[in-house]
Amino acid sequence: MIAIIAEKPSLARNIVAGIGEMKKKNGYFENSEYIVTWAFGHLFSLCDIEDYSPLPSESRKWTLDNLPCFPDKFRFRLKKDDKGKEDDGVKKQFETIKALLNRKDVDKIVNAGDSDREGEIIVRLCVNNALSENKPFYRLWLPDQTPQTVSKALSEMKEEKEYENLANEGFSRTYIDWLYGVNLTRYASIKTGTLLRVGRVIIPIVKAIYDRDLEIENFKPEIYYALVSKAKTNGEVIELTSKYKFSAAEKAKAERCCERMNVFEAVVTDKKSKKEILFPGKLYSLTKLQNFLGKKYKMPMEKSLSIVQKLYENGYVSYPRTNSEYLATNEKDKVKQIISGVKKLGYPVVFKDKKTIFDDSKIESHSALTPTYKIPDKGSLNDDEFTVYSAILRRFVAIFCEEECYIEKSELTISLGGKEDYSIKGSIILTEGWTKYDGGEKKDKMLPKLEKGDKVNVDFHPEEKQTQPPKHYTIETLNNYLKNPFKDDKTSDDNDDEDYKAIFKGLELGTEATRTCIIDNAKKSGYISLKKDVYFIENGGKYLIEQLSDMNISMDKYKTSRLGQALKKVYHGEMTIDESVKMAENEIRQVFETDKNAGSGFYGDVIGKCPKCGKNVARGRYSYACEDFPDKCDFKINLRILGCPVPKEQAAKLLTNGKTDKMNFTSLKTGKVFSSSLKLDESKKVVFDFT
């Protein structure tokens, strides 16, 4: 008997569809050969710091006493619910899995997690915690969830040990993110008195948006003068722009230059045109699909991912969390089958065997997003699902379209007295080809009716212009930045070798599988916002980045990409889990050492007596604190509370009178300014007083 553990119920149902007739039981399916059961995604999570700490387990107060926490061995436990209590559904399903795997008639176990590092460890954790004795262990790897693919994959399963490096990468990622998230979130939150969510990837994402918005805020436009001619020749306005520019103070100089230019004769010195094929874009990776949907339909990333995941689970598209825009050479027969299905929809598609489509060197784990041979019934998709599915289908049709798109490109060269040449380019679509299905609106750009040797009238004059600020990040530009944060914005996308090298080295920030969730968490935490398809930093994000900067906590793209590279080395067997974890621990240790070396020494005069223990209170690095802080006394007043600096005089008044004057604070959630005093409550904590 073969026991298959799927990552989630929907996948289990699709596996059952591929196997054939099975009886539904309580928490699993079964026939004479197979048992198919499932998890609910992660059934296990890493233990909390308190579970490793020598402090009493009943004490759940965050404290610096158990930081930094570097477990000798990471421990997992069954996942709890949102309230931190035992999840009855999780416990029941795991007990079902445990009972099934340990049945005497089960002699083979199959990992049917999603085909990525996360799916790999989700099922491994179930098996590792359930099995009482070892049994043969295999992997079901599904590029899509159609019955035919499931049936084929069941006959081609490899031993689970062949995916050891993938699992190691998954566990390394889990441990490293726990180390950063738990240690630095608690550290920063304790130091500031505000919950700050610090993570390996969320911080560089928020910081990128913070830096860009700060650039825009501080940008001061400068006036300059461009030399522009807009004069009619044969009834058409011919616009020419010189390469020369002049500053605001050089307007007179610009005018004199224009006068000299207008003396010269402008002549068409060359006219050329050529017919060429316009090729479609590549198949979609998840990033490129989200870019398209965000730009055209203003669809947020979490929504597009949720929809494409549902399409995948319904068997309509291939595995969605892919970073490649290419297909594997061993998928050619599968593509021919998809083409047969797409033809029935009336599209003129034919198989094409090209390096621009099939390229194993540009595939890490999963090939590009495509439709499958399973076509959704008319009306079975809602509007948003149809939009996403159509985008994937239309791109596939464009790639394999029988009809080529031919265009005529033309160029005029106009010389101004032999002193400066100007180029005017145009293009005309001769045959639409694939653009009918995936091209959007293509407009002809006609050249002026001029021939070689024709004279062109000119009337150059200085035209006042302003330098432009950087643009806010959009879904597309932020995604592109995260995919390759070291790529020059101006670098052409025509040659994607640089991007794939960056991905394979681990230089990207986050992955296709994680970025959407992390960006969504940043929005939910009030750090950033998305308006239409444009990202903005919020007050909570400003506060986060500025506080981390004050504490010398750096999670820039360089540090994050170094950790990403370490994970790739684990995946390729070039680094062990322990080595990657030690690397992260050293980075985190530096934060605490820097703070320790800076000391809790006081930078200012004593401002009063501690209301808890009676010792002196003075200004420290992050707060006005008791001289016994943090070892013997935990009293402190943060130097800045919700964006408001707490002056020394107000802190002294709080100690003396138990209350400050009214001050203005900024809500991290709404961004609105509110007025309140600060007071000490019964436990001598600093709280707001609106009376």
Q: Where on the chain are the PLM-derived regions?
A:
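Amphipathic alpha-helical transducer elements in NTP-driven molecular machines
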Residues: 9-16, 33-36, 40, 64, ...
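Basic, low-complexity terminal or inter-domain segments flanking catalytic cores
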Residues: 2, 80-83, 90, 101, ...
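Conserved short loop/turn motifs at secondary-structure junctions
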Residues: 1-3, 112-115, 193-195, 273-282, ...
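Intrinsically disordered, low-complexity regulatory segments
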Residues: 1-174, 178, 461, 468-469
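C-terminal or mid-to-C-terminal helical accessory/interaction module adjacent to the motor/catalytic core
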Residues: 149-229, 274
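Structured, non-catalytic alpha/beta "coupling" segments that mediate domain-domain communication
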Residues: 25-55, 203-247, 399-445, 621-625, ...
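Metal- or metallocofactor-binding catalytic centers and their adjacent structured scaffolds
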Residues: 248-282, 290
